[in-house]
Structures are given as structure tokens and as C-alpha cells.
Regions:
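N-terminal interaction/assembly modules
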Residues: 1-136
Length: 136
């Protein structure tokens, strides 16, 4: 697993924990740093801050283009994977679009239901197609 893949996984863990505990992701990040000797990779912090900053717009896009699913009905882990993937796809120019989608699908394969990778791939693929108009 590459350093960036590990950073994505760590960011996912922190974002998921924050939502489950109903705390700010930055508060969860701070608690994680205080609890463990593990250094949180700078890219994990970038993801967390990016998802927080762009979260409303990301959720709007996900809600608009997910077919048959509202954000509230999605499994929480899928919701976090999609938020990370959408942030990388739409707002992080350092990550190629295909990599953003592929990495999100891999997280879904490792951590979610059997149907989740297909759902994540389809929704992020749709956002990738619409990217020029979404950010215009």
C-alpha cells in the first residue's frame, strides 16, 4: 500500500470516527494525535481539511447524482469514501482523476459491502464525466 493510500485510509478512519461521535473532524484529528504516537500524514490532514472545506458542495453533488440513494441512506463508510474520492477528483489537482476513482473503489472493496465498489465507481465516474460543468 502506497503512502498516499495509507493517508487516505487514515483520513477515512478519522472522518468516520468524527461522524460517529458527532464531533468536528479537526477535533477527532486532534484526539487521534494526542492518543497515539502515530504521526498523521500531512496528506491525511489535507484530505480532512479539504473534505471539511468543500463538504457542503461535495454532499450536494453526491446527493444530486447518486441514483436511488440519499446521503443519509448510504452506509457511513461509503459516504466517507465518496467524500474523499469526490474531493480528490474535483478539488485536488495533484491527483489524476482515474487515481482518485480507483483509490476510492479500493477502499470500498476493503471496508464496505460487496455492492459498494460498483456504487462508488459509478457515482465517482459520473462526477468525473461532469467535472468540467460542475466546477464551471
Amino acid at each position: 500500500m502506497s503512502a498516499r493510500s495509507k493517508a487516505r485510509r487514515r483520513a477515512l478512519d478519522i472522518l468516520f470516527e468524527a461522524e460517529q461521535r458527532s464531533v468536528s473532524p479537526l477535533e477527532a484529528l486532534k484526539a487521534r494525535r494526542e492518543k497515539t504516537d502515530t504521526v498523521v500524514a500531512p496528506y491525511s490532514v489535507d484530505i480532512i481539511e479539504g473534505v471539511m472545506t468543500q463538504g457542503e458542495q461535495i454532499d450536494e453533488f453526491l446527493g444530486t447524482y447518486s441514483q436511488g440513494w440519499t446521503l443519509d441512506r448510504m452506509p457511513a463508510v461509503d459516504r466517507m469514501i465518496l467524500r474523499i474520492g469526490a474531493w480528490e477528483l474535483l478539488y485536488n489537482a495533484d491527483v489524476p482523476d482515474g487515481v482518485a476513482v480507483s483509490e476510492a473503489v479500493e477502499l470500498a472493496k476493503m471496508l464496505s459491502t460487496d455492492e459498494s465498489p460498483t456504487f462508488v465507481n459509478g457515482l465517482l465516474g459520473r462526477l468525473q464525466q461532469l467535472k468540467p460543468t460542475l466546477l464551471a
